[in-house]
Amino acid sequence: MENSNCDAKAHISAVIFDLDGTLLSTEQVTRDILKDFLAKYGKVPDKEKEKKRLGMANKEAAISIVNDYELPLTPEQFTLEIMPMYYGLWKQAKALPGVNRLMGHLRKHGVPFALASNSIRKNIDAKISHHEGWKENFTAILGSDQVKSGKPSPDMFLEAANRMSVDPDHCLVIEDSLIGVKAGKAAGMKVVAVPSLQIETHLYSIADSILHSLVEFQPQLWGLPQFRDWVDNTLPIEPIRIEGIFSNGLLLEYEDDGWSALPDQVWGLYIGWAKIDRQKVLKAVISIGWDLNCCISKRKIQAFTVDESNESIHDSKMQLLLVGYLRRSCYAGNMLNNLEILEEDKLAVRAFLNLPAFSYNTLNTFLQGDAVEDSLLP
């Protein structure tokens, strides 16, 4: 949903990324840490309170948490106690959809890009150290402890522009939090919001563009070189795995204590492989989005097997391996439309998945080296 004020006349010359929730799924892999920490003090996390802390600098977040939960600690003591719990999990954080593609594209075309995060610099370095080539490819890296004030102050973005020798009005900021979006606008920069909480997208109207995922990003709208990496009307993506129970065309995803294993930024119409009850493997089209109806917001995953009717599949265990992106999902108001598979979609699925690089056997061989347990493998 690339929208609103995209303007190629802006002549964007550099890009500034946020880190947590924008480039990396750190917020997802560490979401249980606060719950475990608060349990020691007889407290339970409040989701509404945690939403307001999205994007906060470490110091401000610590003060806010201690006050909100009335902890018998100073903010400094809280930080000293909780931070070691994070260190071991950062290595599990994965690049979010479209991130490696975009950074590689910018590097290939000589467009400088920087990293500006409300984390302190030491923690930034620890997080990105698990991703080969990342640190070396940023023209500048800034943490909240390297400027006078963290976001929503514009200080960090202005300093990043200065270090890249680019005027602020020629910089494009990519952010997942409202705090970060406000900082980018205060710096006089164009801002693309990719909300890490998709149910909150209505709050991001000050951004110049709002996307569900960086897979949707179109650099040519900002005067940057266009992507040319689609194959047979499909965009190859890093494999994404989903497991659950399939019935009546819908996949009920297995969740951990009410949390999805998927980042909110996995959104759109995908193609891939569906494995039924650990036996039959079929080509499939998968629609992923959110129903934002009234007070209930939930992810909706629809799957359509291409060469066999869905009607024969009821209450079965299904494992999906997404390997290609087709387009955005369709909405009517706040409701995700039922999946309608066009004949051209079927042709795209067959053509793409028949390519040797995306055959199921080839992907099995590739994924056998993955450190994450892969129940998709035979």
Describe the function of each predicted region.
Residues 37-38, 57-72, 127, 161, ...:
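Helix-loop "lid/cap" segments that line or gate small-molecule binding pockets
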Residues 40-43, 69-73, 132-137, 165-166:
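Short helix-capping segments at alpha-helix termini
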Residues 2-51:
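Active-site neighborhood of HAD-like aspartate-dependent phosphohydrolases
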Residues 22, 34, 81, 99-129, ...:
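Substrate-recognition element of Asp-dependent hydrolases with the DxDx(T/V) motif
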Residues 64-101, 109:
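Metal-dependent phosphoesterase signature
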Residues 44-45, 57, 167, 190:
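Short coil/turn motifs that cap or connect alpha-helices
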Residues 238-378:
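Phosphate/ribose-recognition catalytic cores of enzymes acting on nucleotide-derived substrates
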Residues 1-12, 104, 120-237:
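Asp-based, Mg2+/Mn2+-dependent phosphohydrolase catalytic module
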